[in-house]
Amino acid sequence: MSSSEPPPRYEPPVEPVNGIVQPPVIPPAERPGRNTNQLQYLIKTVMKVIWKHHFSWPFQQPVDAKKLNLPDYHKIIKQPMDMGTIKKRLENNYYWSAKETIQDFNTMFNNCYVYNKPGEDVVVMAQTLEKVFLQKIESMPKEELELEPVTAKGGKKKQRAPATPKSSSGGAGASTGSGTSSAAVTSGPGSGSTKVSVAASSAQQSGLQGATGAGGGSSSTPGTQPGSGAGGAIAARPVSAMGGTVSSTAGGAPSIPPISTMPPHTVPGSTNTTTTAMAGGVGGPGAAGANPNAAALMASLLNAGQTGAYPGAPGQTAVNSSSLLDGSTAAVAAAAAAAAAAAAAAGGAAGAAGGAGTIPAVAVNAANAVQAYVNAGVSVGVDAVIPPQQPAKIKKGVKRKADTTTPTANAFESPYTQMDSKSAKIATRRESNRQDLTFQGSGYNMSPLGVSGVPGLGGLVAGGVAGVAVAKNKEKLSDALKSCNEILKELFSKKHSGYAWPFYKPVDAEMLGLHDYHDIIKKPMDLGTVKRKMDNREYKSAPEFAADVRLIFTNCYKYNPPDHDVVAMGRKLQDVFEMRYANIPDEPVANAAHHHGHGHGHGHGHGHGHGHGHGHGHGHGYGGSSSLKHDASDSSSEDSSDTENESNSDEERSARLKMLESKLLGLQEEIRKLSEEASAKKKAKKKLKEKKKSIGGGSGSGSASHHCHATGGGANAGGAGGPGSGGHGSVSVPGGVGSLGPGGAGGANLNALLGGSLVGHGGAAVAGGVPNVGALHSQVHDVAMAFSQMAGGGAAAGAGFGAGVTAAGASSGGKAGTLAGALAAGAAAGAGGTTAGSGSSKGAKSKGGRGAKGSGAGGVGASNNAAAGNAAGGAAGAAAGAGSVGGVGGAGAAGGGNASKRAKGSSSAGAGGGVGGANASAGGAGARGSSKKKPSQVMNFDSEEEDTAKPMSYDEKRQLSLDINKLPGDKLGRVVHIIQNREPSLRDSNPDEIEIDFETLKPSTLRELESYVASCLRKKTHKKPSGKSKDEQMAEKKQELEKRLQDVTGQLGASKKTAKKDESASSKVEAVQPANPVSSSSSSSDSSSSSSSDSSSSDSSDSEAGDGDERPPRKKKSRDSNGSNVNNPSINVVMGGNLPSGALSPTTMLMGLDHVVNSNTPTSQMSNMLGNANPLTAAAMLNNNNKTSLPGSNFGGAPAPGNMMHAGAGVPVAGAAVSASTGQQHNKNGPNDLSKVQPGGPINAALPPHSFAGGTATVATSQSSGGIRIASNLHKPSGLGGGDLGEHHAALAAALTSGINSTGTAGGGINNNGGSNNNANPLGGSHGDAMVNASLASLASGLKQIPQFDDPVEQSLASLEFSAGSTGKSGLTDNFLMQQHLMQPAGPQQQQQQQQQQPFGHQQQQQQQQQQQQQQQQHMDYVTELLSKGAENVGGMNGNHLLNFNLDMAAAYQQKHPQQQQQQAHNNGFNVADFGMAGFDGLNMTAASFLDLEPSLQQQQMQQMQLQQQHHQQQQQQTHQQQQQHQQQHHQQQQQQQLTQQQLQQQQQQQQQQQHLQQQQHQQQHHQAANKLLIIPKPIESMMPSPPDKQQLQQHQKVLPPQQSPSDMKLHPNAAAAAAVASAQAKLVQTFKANEQNLKNASSWSSLASANSPQSHTSSSSSSSKAKPAMDSFQQFRNKAKERDRLKLLEAAEKEKKNQKEAAEKEQQRKHHKSSSSSLTSAAVAQAAAIAAATAAAAVTLGAAAAAALASSASNPSGGSSSGGAGSTSQQAITGDRDRDRDRERERERSGSGGGQSGNGNNSSNSANSNGPGSAGSGGSGGGGGSGPASAGGPNSGGGGTANSNSGGGGGGGGPALLNAGSNSNSGVGSGGAASSNSNSSVGGIVGSGGPGSNSQGSSGGGGGGPASGGGMGSGAIDYGQQVAVLTQVAANAQAQHVAAAVAAQAILAASPLGAMESGRKSVHDAQPQISRVEDIKASPGGQGQSSPAQQSPQDRAAAKRAEQRRAEQERRRREALAGQIDMNMQSDLMAAFEETL
C-alpha cells in the first residue's frame, strides 16, 4: 500500500499575483508524482483532445481576475484550476494517480459552474468540455499501473494510489469513487494490516470503511474497490478522497476530496469494484473482523464517520440523511464501533464467514454492518451523499451535467457529482447497477453497505454481491419510473439548466455560508441525489421519486425567502416537473400505483400525519411493487423524516404540501390504478409472475408502509421513510423491518434485521454491536421515532433484539430510519448478511440462485430497503435474508421483480455465510428479477438483459439499422430513449443530435431496439423485422423469467404447480421453496407472496386497519375472521360470558377494544390485557379478534392506561414511545396495520425501549388477535365460542405471552428496557416480546395460512402463489385473501408454508427431527431459508413480518422443517406446521434472528434444539420419558444431545413421523386444527369437503393461530405474540397433535387435552390417525414414513416414557391435564421456554449470549434444562449442559433478568416437565425468578412459568409466578400459568395457586395455572383465564415445542381458552367451565371445554367440523358482506391477486 498510498495531497492556497493564481506544477519532494498508464492516457489522449477542442480556450490558462475585471473571483473560487496547469502537472509527473488529475479537471469545471451563472457561454463551454472529458475518461484503462519512471511525464501522483489500481479501474472517477463503504469494509481482504494504518489516516474519512478494510481491501483487489472505493479511496487518499467528503474538513483540497468521496461511492457501483468487492469482500469482512482492531477500527471508522460530517452521517446513515449529524453521529459511530467491537468479540470466536475468519463473520458483519452503515451513511448518510452512491463507476461519461450544473457543490458532493455523478449516472446505469443495488440497498438505508458490511456473513458475498450485485442489480424501471427517469433527464437538460442548476447538487451549506441550513432543512435533497437514487433503483414507484423531487422544492421554499431568485427558479422548475410528472404513463404508474396505488389510497388514508401513509398503503396494493413503489411511503417516509426533523412551521407547510401532493399522487394513482386495473389484470398475470417475484418486494413495501404506520405518523413516515425512504429507509422495513421492521416487516424486519439480524448475524457479536448501533441510532434519531419505528420494525427484530431492534427502530424513524434502514439493511445483511448485500448486489443476482433467494429478500430487502422499505423485505428479507428465510423474506423484499430472481438464490443461502452469500445472490437475483420485471424498462436493462441478451450478428445489426431508418420520425424518439437509457455513455447526449454506432451498443440495447423496431414495423407494415418480434421476445423473456422464477422460487409458472411443491417437499429447503412458495419459493415467489402478503398484509393491515384510516376494515377482517366474533360486542359478550369475569362485559370489552384501538396502543392494550388480566381487557383483546381494539388496550399492558402497572415502569418510557407509535399506528392501521406497523413500530419500539414487553407483546398479540381471529373467523366464523375464544385467547395469549415472553423471555432485554414495564418481567419483555411476537406471528401466520388453504390443492396453490394462498379459501379467501393478499399474502403463504410445513412440522417435527440431521446440513439451508423466509416475512410480511420476521425465522426454522413441513403443508393447505412449529417460530424468531445471525451453527443448534425441544415436546407429549431422555441427553451432551437428540429426534421423528403420518392425515385435520391452535385436527378430506368450514373449524380450534393470522398480518408484534402463542399452542397441539387428530371441533380440545397426556398422545396419535387422503406426495411420503417413524418414535417414546414417566407421572398426578400438557410440554416447554427465553434473552442480550443460551437451551431441550442461562451466557450456548443451564438459570434467577431461563434451571430441577415449562417460563421471566420457585410448582407450574416466564413469575412455580405475577401477571401464566399471565397482581397468587389467584384477576389467572386451577381459571377470568389456562396448557405443550412461542403462548394460553382447553384436556372439568364459556362464545368446534374431545369420535369431530365449516361459511358470508366495506382497493388487489393466483 505504501507504494500505492500517496502522501496526503496538500496544496497550500496560492495568493493571486496580478489577479492570477498559478497553482504549483512541480511535485513537492515529500510527495513525488508517479507515472501511470492512466496518467499517460490522460496526457496523451484526454488532454490532447480537450486542449484542441474549440471550447477549451477559456480554460487553457489561469483566470486573470484583473484582466477580466472579476474582483470577487478569488474570493469565491478558493482553488483555481485551469487546463494549462493540469497539463503542466501531467508533464511534470505532479500527480500520483489519474484520480487527482480528474479531480483537478472537476475542480476546474466546478469553479466555472460555481462562479458563472448557468446558461452563460463559458458554462456551456465548460459543460461541453466536461462531456468530452468524461467520454474520454470512459475509455481510460481501468487498472492504474505504475509505469517505469522512464516517462517522467506520465507520472501523476495519485493520492489514492493504494486502491488506485482498482479504484482507478473504477474509472477516473471510479478509482476515486471506489469508496463503497461497504465494499471497502468487506473488501478488506488484504486490508487486515493495512487497514489499521489506513484506518488511522483514513479512519475518519473512510469512516468505518477505510479502517475495516477499505484501505487494505481496496488495494488488495479490484473487487475491494467497492469497499475500497470508500475505504480505499479514503484510505489511499484520505484527505482528498474521503476527507473532503467525509469531514469536508479533512483533506487538503476540498474540491478534490469531494470528488474522491463521490468516486469512492462510485467505485462500488463500478463493475470492477463489484467484482473485486466480492473477492475483497470475502477476505474483507474477515480481514476487518480478523483485525483485532476491527472493533477499534470500527470504532475509529465510526468515529471517523463521526468525525467526518459525512462519514458520521453515514454512520448514522439515516440520521445523516436527515442531517442528523449530531453528536449522535458520534454516538452512533461509537455505538457502531462498540457494536462492531462486540460483534468482533462475540463474533470473533464465532468464526467469520468472511475471509479473515479471524473474526467471526458475525463480528465482521457487525463491523461491516456498522461500517457499511457508516460508509453507507457516508455515501448515503447525507443527502448530499446521494451522488456518491450513484457514481458507482468511473464511467462518468455523460453524467457530468449534474455535477456541472451545480454551482454550489458540497465539497465532497461536487466532485462526486461531477465525477461521480457523471460516472455514476453513466456508470451507475451500467455498472452502477449492481452498485446501485448495493447502494440502493444502502441507498438511504445504507443497507447495501450494511449488507456489504454485514455480508460479513457472506462477507465476500455480501461484499462481492454488494459491489457486484450492486453493479448488476439494476432492476428494470417500471414504465412510470422510466417516465420519471425521462423527466429527470429532462430536468438535467440544457433546456432547463438555466433555472435548474441550483438543484443539481446538494446544497453546500459550508461553501455558501448557510450555517443554519441543516438546522432548517432536515432532509436535504437535490436532483443529483434523485438521479443517483434513480440510477440506483432506489425508487420503487413514481410517487417515491416525485416525493423526493418535491422535497427539493419544498426545502428550497422552506429555507429561502419567497422573493429569492432560487425560489423563483424552484417554482419554475417545479412547474416543469409537475407538468411532466402529470403525464407519466398510466401503466407504469399502475405498476407503481399498483404496488403503490393500491396501497396508495390506503396509504394516504393512513398517512399518519404526513400523508406518508401512502407508502404504506402501497404495500398492500400489490405487494410486490408496492413495496417497491413505496414512493409515497418513501416520500412519505422521507417527508415524515423531513417533517419530523424539519422545523415545524416550514415543516408543516412542506409536509402539508407534500401530503397534498402525495394525496394527489395517491388519487392519481388510484385513478390510474383503476383505469389500469383492467390492463393491469391482464398484465397482472404476467406481472404477477414477475411481480410475484417482485411482489415479495411489494409486500416488503407494504411492510414498509406498515412500518411507516407502525412508526406512527412521524415515525411512520420516518420509519417507513427510514427504511422506506431510501428506500423507505426503514422499511426500512426490512426487516424489514422498518424492514423488518419494518419498520414494518420491512422496517421491522430491517430493524429486526438490524437488531436481530445484525445481532443475529453477528450473533452475539453483532447483537452486541448492533444494539449499540441501535442505541446510537436511537440517539441519533429520535429515540421515540426509532422506537416507534423499532416497534414497527424492531418488533420482529425486537423479538430477538430489543437493542438491535431499537437501533433499527431508531434508524427506522426518520433519518434514523434511513440509517436504520441502512443498519437494518446492514442487519438484514448481517442477519441476511448478504441478504441485504444480495439485495444490493445484483451481482449475486440469480446466480445466488436459491441462496440468493434468501439474500434476495434481504438484498432486495436491502435494496428495497432503500427502495421500498422492503427493508422488511429487505430487512426482513435481509434479516430473513440472514438465513434462507432472509432469502425468502428477502425475496419478498426483493420481491418486486427481484423476488423471482432472488428466489433463485434461496437455495444458495445455505446457512450462515452461505446464507449471506446465497442471500446476497438471492438479493441480486431478486434485484435482477426486478429488472426482469420490466425487461424493456429503462435502466434496468443492464442488470438482467445485459446478462441474457444475445450478441447481435452483423447481419442483424445491419437489418436493425435499416429497420430504424424505416421508422417514422415520431418513433425515433423512443429509439433514442432506449439507447440513452441503456447506454451510459450516451445518456447525456442531446437526443436531437445523437450519434449512434451500433458496434458500441450493448447487446441488450440492440435487442431492445430490435424488439421495439419490430413492434413498430409490425404494426405499420405487418412485416416482422429480422429480429424476434417483441411478442416472441417477451414470450421468451417470460419463459426465461418463469424458468428462472421456477428455479428461484419454484413458485412461478411451473413452480406454481404442486409438483413443484412436492419437489420442494422432497427437496427440503429448496424443495420447500417450491413446494411452499412460502418457504423458498416463498423466498421469491413467496417473497413476492410474502411481499404480497406483506403488501397484502400491509394492505390488509392498512386496509384492514382501515387502510390506515379506519380500523374497522381491520376489525372487519378480524370480525370476518372471527365470524362469530363478527360482532365485537357479541364477541365481547361471548368473551365476557366465556370469561366469566364480568369485567369483560361486552361494553367494557368493546370499550376496551375501541379504547384500545383508539388508544392505538396495542401495546397498552396488550399491556392491559396482559397487565390487566382483567377479563374485560382480555376479553376485549379476545374480542379484538374482531376488532382490533383488542390488541391495543388489553394487551398493551404497558402502554394502556389500564395497564399502567406494566406500562408504569417501562411502558411510559419505551411503552410511551411504542404506545404512541402503536397507538397512532393502531388508530391508523388498526390492529392489522398495527400488527404490521405496530409489530414493526410499537413492538420494536416497545421492545427496545419498552420495557413493557407486555405492551409490545400485547400489540403483537392484539394484532395477532385480530389477525388470528381473522384467520380463525375466516375459517370458522361460528366456532368463536371455543375457537374464537381460543383465537382471541390465542391472541391474548400471544399478547400475554408476548408480554410475558417479552417480559420473561426477553427478560433481560426488557428488564433493561422495560424493567419498568413489567416490573420483574420487563426484562424479558422486549425480547420475549419479540420472540413471543415472533411466535405469535408464526402462529398468526399459521393461522392465516390455515384459513388460506382449505383444500390441499388450494394449499398447494397457495403455497405456490401467495395470492393463491390468500385465495385458498373462498370465504376465508375473500377476507383472508384481502387480508392475506393485502395484508399478508406472503405472510400467509410463508406461514402457510410454515404451517403447511408445520403440518409437516408436526409430523415434521418428527420429520424435522429426522431431518434434523439433514437439517443440520439443512440447517444452514434451512436457516438461510428461514432467514429467507424471515426476510420474506419481514419483507413480505413487513409489518406483519416483523414478527414474522422472527416468525419467519421461526418459519424459517419451520421451513427448515417446512420443507418437510411443506410437505405436510401440502397436507391440508393448513400449515399446521406453523403452529406445530410455533416453538420454532418463536425460537426461530429469536433464534432465527440471532441464530441466523450468529452462527449457522448456533442456529442449527438452536434449530436442532428447537427441533429437539419440539421433538421433546412431541416426545414429551408422546412420552415424558423421551423428554427425560432428552434431558439426560441434554445433560450428557447438549451439543451431542443435539446430535443425539437429532438421532433420538430422528427416531422420534420417525416415530413421530409415523405418528405424524398418522397425524398427518389427522394432521391434515390437525394442520387445520394446528393452524387453529392445532387443537382441532381435521381430516384432509373434511378440509377438502368443506374447506372453508373445516378450515374455519380448524381455525377455530386453532383459534390462536387464526387470531394471529390477522395480527400476523396486522400486528407483527402481536402476531409474534400470537405466533408465539400459536406456536406454543401448535406445539402443544403438536404435542397433542396425534390426539388432536381426534379432536375435531370442540372435542378436539379435549382430545388435545388427552393428547397432552403422553400415553394418549401416542395412542391417540395412532388411533386417531385416520387414513386421510394424502394431501400430496408429501403426505403419502409421510404415510410411508409414518410407520417407520412411528415405530421408531414409539420406541423412542417408550424409552422416553420410561424415563419421563416418573416425571410425567408426577406432573400428571399433579394435574393430569396440565401435567400431561404441561409436563409433556413442560419439559419440552421448559426446553422450549428455556430456548425461547434463551432466545429472547439472546435477543435481549443481543443474541450472542442469547444464541448461546438458545443453543444451550436447545441443547438442553430436555425439559428442564431450561437454558436458563443460555440466554444469559452464550458461552454455554450449545455446550452448556443442564448444569450449566441450571447455573445459568440460577444466574438468571439471581439476576432476575432470568434471561428468562433461570426459572428453567430451577424448574428443571423439578421434574423435567415441570422444570421444562417452569424453567422456560421462569427463564422467560428473567425473573424466572419465580421460575425457580415455579419449578417447585412442578411441571405445570413450570410450564406455566414458561408462559409466564416473561412475567418472571411465570414462574411457574407459583411462588415466583407470584412474584412475577405482581409484575406482569404473565408469570401467572407460569403457574396456571397462563391464567396469571394476564392478571397482573393475581399473578403471584395465580402462580402459586396454579391459577386460582391468577384466575381471579382477569388475569384469567391462570387459568388456573393448570387444570387444577382450571376452575379458578373459570373463575372470574375464566374466559380469559381459562383460555389462558388452556393456552397455558397448550402453551406448555407448545412450549416444549417452542419454548419461546410456548412461553408467550403459554402465558397467553393461560389467558386464553386454549390454555383452558389444554387444562381442560387435562382436567376436562376444569376446562369445561371454560369450555362451556368457550362453547358459549362459540359452540366451539374447537371448544376448549368439551370434556372429552379426545374421546370424540372422528365422526363427531367431523360433524363438529362441518358445523364449524357451516359457521365459517356463514361467517365468511358475513365477512364477505363486511368485505364489501373493505376498500375497493383491497378488493381490487384481492381480485388481482386472485386472478394471479388462479
From Swiss-Prot:
One of its GO terms (biological process) is negative regulation of DNA-templated transcription. Residues 145-284, 396-432, 590-655, 677-735, 832-858, 891-956, 1016-1139, 1217-1260, 1384-1416, 1502-1530, 1580-1616, 1645-1728, 1745-1918, 1957-2023 are annotated as: Disordered. Residues 1028-1046, 1680-1708, 1776-1791, 1998-2017 have a biased composition (Basic and acidic residues). The modification Phosphoserine is found at S452, S943, S1653, S1980, S1988. Residues 34-140, 475-584 form the Bromo domain. It is found in: Membrane. Residues 636-649 have a biased composition (Acidic residues). Residues 404-421, 1121-1131, 1222-1232 have a biased composition (Polar residues). It holds the Pfam family BRD4_CDT. Keywords: Bromodomain, Developmental protein, Membrane, Phosphoprotein, Repeat, Transmembrane, Transmembrane helix. One of its GO terms (cellular component) is chromatin. The chain crosses the membrane at residues 330-350, 451-471, 750-770, 790-810, 816-830, 874-894, 1731-1751, 1939-1959. One of its GO terms (molecular function) is chromatin binding. Residues 711-735, 910-927, 1814-1828, 1835-1856, 1885-1915 have a biased composition (Gly residues). This is Homeotic protein female sterile. It comes from Drosophila melanogaster. The gene is fs(1)h.
